[in-house]
Amino acid sequence: MAVKVLVVDDSGFFRRRVTEILSSDPNIVVVGTATNGKEAIEQALALKPDVITMDYEMPMMDGITAVRHIMQRIPTPVLMFSSLTHEGARVTLDALDAGAVDFLPKNFEDISRNPQKVKQLLCEKINSISRSNRRSSGIGSASAASPAPAAPAPSTLSSRAPAPSAAAPARAVPSRTVAPAAAPAAHAHHTPAHPTTTGTAKRKAYKLVAIGTSTGGPVALQRVLTQLPANFPAPLVLIQHMPAAFTKAFAERLDKLCKISVKEAEDGDVLRPGLALLAPGGKQMMVDSRGTVKILPGDERLNYKPCVDITFGSAAKSYGDKVLSVVLTGMGADGREGARLLKQVGSTVWAQDEASCVIYGMPMAIVKAELADAIYSLDDIGRHLVEACL
């Protein structure tokens, strides 16, 4: 069945171009367009699209306000278009706070110069988002800044029942330590193929926690990091697929919400306990055995800048078995090869479970490759990090 898309933008040119690009994919049908947030709400209610593309700056009602109304009245995955500026980054993070799933830079130059690349990226996003699991969670909300409850109530964006306790049937165990060989079969059916044990991975003197993520990552990272205490004993490195103009604003926002310190990484930064360094967009981040960070130019041959595999690989080389790595929600398979290197030197690899992912791509790649030592629900990862490291 084709993915139904509603295109919302006050620019006639942009509406037409997005419609043309999406209509070229046989799996996508544009069911309607809107010129402002008010029309977007009306069209969403009438057409019930699978995905909505949304501009921010529009007359009558802006995109963020429209997203909030849509999430309250007819929850639908929203892909935001945003400008590549610091203000655009702030607005985009606000949109994710309101409930949007993901974003793309609104770059008219790219549409003209690289139409095939734009088509591939946009259509891939739409198709993936249409299959996504939605969770209500806000960046910057007061509730999100507090540790998540052990068994959260279902939200307006999720029909999932509350996670059962460890005593409940195994089919819905939200957090489990998995024998690597059993992981793929267990996760695919939500029922372990072999007996598994609930609880936290074996405690080890970790020298580094490395977390990689993509689509859905800004919200997921906030969920995890806000549960860590100020005295968290290990340094952290964060790799989030994000444009260069966005990572500084995102790091600043996380720093305000978290008890630990968070900053955009700079070349020569020193790793220290209770500090999370976010890889800068458009570049690559590596760590060395002296406990310092190296920031390198983004390699055009690589799809991702920053790339989880690059950072994980350097961590494996520099810290051996003293790395605890976590792969969160995201499209694609970035992180799999880096996790493979980490496993080869004896480090620990965790993956987010399918039910709590916005896009079950990167964690699925870890699980299918039999690299996951444990699979945890998003709400449980922060707690398990504390238990494993403190």
Curated annotation (Swiss-Prot):
Record-level GO cellular component terms: cytoplasm
Top-rank lineage group of the source organism: Bacteria
Active site per database record: 214, 241, 334
GO biological process, one term: chemotaxis
Compartment annotation: Cytoplasm
Main EC class the enzyme belongs to: hydrolase
Region described as Disordered: spans on this chain: 132-201
Keyword Transferase set for record: no
Reaction(s) the record says it catalyses: [protein]-L-glutamate 5-O-methyl ester + H2O = L-glutamyl-[protein] + methanol + H(+); L-glutaminyl-[protein] + H2O = L-glutamyl-[protein] + NH4(+)
EC number: 3.1.1.61, 3.5.1.44
Keywords: Chemotaxis, Cytoplasm, Hydrolase, Phosphoprotein
Sites bearing 4-aspartylphosphate, chain numbering: 55
The keyword Hydrolase appears for this protein: yes
Post-translational modifications: Phosphorylated by CheA. Phosphorylation of the N-terminal regulatory domain activates the methylesterase activity.
Residue spans of biased composition, Low complexity class: 132-186
GO molecular function: phosphorelay response regulator activity; protein-glutamate methylesterase activity; protein-glutamine glutaminase activity
Domain Response regulatory: 4-121
SMART domains, per database record: REC (SM00448)
Residues in CheB-type methylesterase domain copies: 195-387
Family of the protein in this entry: Belongs to the CheB family.
Biological role stated in the UniProt entry: Involved in chemotaxis. Part of a chemotaxis signal transduction system that modulates chemotaxis in response to various stimuli. Catalyzes the demethylation of specific methylglutamate residues introduced into the chemoreceptors (methyl-accepting chemotaxis proteins or MCP) by CheR. Also mediates the irreversible deamidation of specific glutamine residues to glutamic acid.
UniProt domain comment: Contains a C-terminal catalytic domain, and an N-terminal region which modulates catalytic activity.
Protein name: Protein-glutamate methylesterase/protein-glutamine glutaminase 1
Taxonomic lineage of the native organism: Bacteria, Pseudomonadati, Pseudomonadota, Gammaproteobacteria, Pseudomonadales
Gene that produces this protein: cheB1
